[in-house]
Design a protein with these regions (language model features):
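N-terminal Rossmann-like NAD(P)+-binding domain of SDR-like oxidoreductases, especially those catalyzing
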Residues: 1-142, 216, 265
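Conserved beta-strand segments of alpha/beta enzyme cores
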Residues: 11-13, 133-135, 173, 204, ...
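Residue-level signal for the nucleotide or nucleotide-sugar donor/cofactor binding architecture
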Residues: 21, 52, 60-63, 103, ...
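Generic structural signal for alpha-helix termini and adjacent loop/cap motifs
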Residues: 53, 71, 75, 159-166, ...
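NAD(P)-dependent short-chain dehydrogenase/reductase
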Residues: 93-99, 121-182, 186-197, 211-213, ...
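Non-catalytic, hydrophobic alpha-helical segments
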Residues: 189, 193, 208, 219, ...
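Amphipathic terminal alpha-helices
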Residues: 267-284
């Protein structure tokens, strides 16, 4: 990952700053860059943090989204904008509604999910009111090497790698293992983002996912089977959420019919890559 980042740094102009919450600075940045495409992924994306500090999540995600749209209008060149929402927008989904289509009701059940619904709707409103060429996506759970251990697959892999290295006892601390999620590799999702912004229809929204659901317990078993040691699994109440959705699985027919995209990297490969990444980090 570090080698790839170094390669990219030689090909991009990197600006560091709190631009999203500073509209004048963001407008200056847009004027200097003159973008054709705007990929807006910056957000407070950790659901539990939205419960402990909901206002920070709402401000960063909603105000940041609005500023991106305002800066795009001010630019005058109408760049294509990708608004990245979340499958969490759908919230509590009834079994009869699975797999989840873009037309499903939105029932957000966390401050984070509410913020993503607001971003989604702002994107549509600025398309409808100002003719900004906005494409919206609702990605389902995506994973890969380098992801923060705040997220479940990276958390499990990091615990295994540290236990293998003798940094702590071989005990795996877990939350809810019954929840089922639609996991895709981030490399597939990023490919989908580019297809969405380049081939998606302005004003439309598209699901991105693997169209398969796996329980968190299945993910854990796959990672444990790749470990070089035996680990004991222990529940940890601190890892449980105030509300959790039992099953999430995407229907991506709309996006596939538009672009031909589908998730290609198997879950097993993604998990092995994540575990190998953390083994490398632990050795440093």
């Amino acid at each position: 990952m570090e080698g790839r980042a170094a390669e990219l740094r030689s090909r991009i102009s990197l600006r560091v700053g709190d631009f999203l919450l500073d509209l004048p600075a963001l407008k200056e940045l847009f004027a200097a860059a003159k973008p054709d495409y705007v990929f807006h992924l910056a957000a407070q994306a950790f659901v539990p943090a939205s419960w402990s500090d909901p206002w920070s999540t709402l401000e960063n995600n909603i105000r940041g989204q609005l500023n991106v749209l305002l800066a795009s209008i001010d630019l005058g060149t109408m760049p294509r904008i990708l608004v990245v929402g979340s499958a969490d927008e759908y919230g509590m989904v009834n079994p009869a509604e699975l797999p989840i289509r873009e037309t499903n009701l939105l029932r957000p059940n966390s401050p984070y999910a509410v913020s993503k619904v607001a971003q989604d709707m702002l994107g549509y409103q600025y398309y409808a009111s100002h003719k900004l060429p906005v494409v919206r996506v609702r990605p389902f759970n995506h994973i890969g090497p380098g992801q923060s251990p705040s997220f479940v697959t990276s958390d499990f892999a990091k615990q295994i790698a540290e236990a293998e290295a003798g940094l702590h006892p071989p005990v795996m601390r877990v939350g809810n293992l019954e929840a089922r999620r639609d996991f895709s590799d981030v490399r597939d999702i990023v490919r989908g983002y580019f297809l969405a912004i380049s081939q998606g229809e302005a004003g439309e929204v598209y699901n991105l996912g693997s169209e398969r659901s796996y329980s968190i317990g299945e993910v854990l078993e796959t990672l444990l089977s790749a470990s070089s040691i035996q680990m004991k699994v222990e529940p940890d109440a601190a890892r449980l959420r105030p509300s959790d959705i039992s099953v999430i699985v995407a229907d991506c027919c709309k996006f596939r019919s538009r672009t031909g995209w589908r998730a290609e990297i198997p879950l097993e490969q993604s998990l092995q890559d994540i575990l190998d990444y953390w083994r490398g980090q632990v050795r440093k």
